[in-house]
Amino acid sequence: MKKFGLLACAALFLFLTGCTEDPAPETRVTPTPGRVQVEITALPTATPVPTPTPLFLPRDDKGNLDINQDLENSLEPTSFPLAADTVILLYHTHGEEAFRQEKGYTYKETGESTYKTLETDKSILALGRLLQQELKGMGYTVLHDETDCEPPDIYSAYSRSLQVMEKYPQATVFIDLHRNAANVKEKKDDVVLLDGKRCAKMFFVVGTGIGTRPGEYDIAPDWQQNYLLAKSMTEKLREADPELCGDIRLKVGRYNQHMSPYCMLVELGHNANTFADAANTIPYLARAIGVVLPLLPAEDAP
């Protein structure tokens, strides 16, 4: 009787506590009559969510980006027909930029920097006048604003050139004409020969507006559209000479390109080029605009 009582107590203890020396079954419980069969299976494995490929990747710590190659390949150069009454605004965020001085081309420097002048017939403004003249001869309506946006601080010049753009609500195409940065230390023949003339090289800058910190810009540009415009221009210019137009510079900045999907920031020549080199490139730039942004006949305007 005592032995039976001890066994019964032990069985009751094991039942209540679930303690047992035998390992628990790993996959299946043997069916018992009158009881529900329970099958133990592994939990389903979550399907990993693929990380989307970014549209661009940092190239360096200077704000340069590399565009996603698949996106780059999908952007086929094209043309963007414009209504006959489209207004183009030509302006200069850095309007004091000038070129290498030589006989017949000298100027008084601003004192703030070499290769800069307030003499508008010697600065990048003079090239803007040439481009305006070329485009007007092709039938375009072109406004050329010569406001000096650099003073008092070049680092805030884009805030002032934005004010210039906002003065012309009728404009839909914006061209910000620059000379590339003054960092070439020696005279060099960095030109291409076209029709027997020395022509300065050029390239386009496109701003993504992602900024260097969250919330830096309240409105981001349609950078893919502006990139496609720049790519179409680049390909057209390279038909004249493969080296005439360099690769597009994709940047983290905005460069006021949120104002329109038809914004072009043009870097024409550099400080070691002559003014004549840069002036010789203007007709090729104008012709490329004529092909990529053709004017529709007035009766075909949307």
Q: How should these model regions be labeled?
A:
Residues 1-5:
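Positively charged n-region of N-terminal signal peptides that target proteins for export
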Residues 15-18:
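C-terminal motif of bacterial Sec signal peptides marking the signal peptidase cleavage site
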Residues 20-22:
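Bacterial signal peptide processing site
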Residues 29-172, 179-190, 279, 283, ...:
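N-terminal catalytic or cofactor-binding beta/alpha core of small enzyme domains
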Residues 89-91, 142-144, 173-176, 203-205, ...:
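Structural recognition of the beta-strand scaffold that forms the well-ordered cores
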Residues 109-114, 182-222:
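A short, glycine/acidic-enriched catalytic loop
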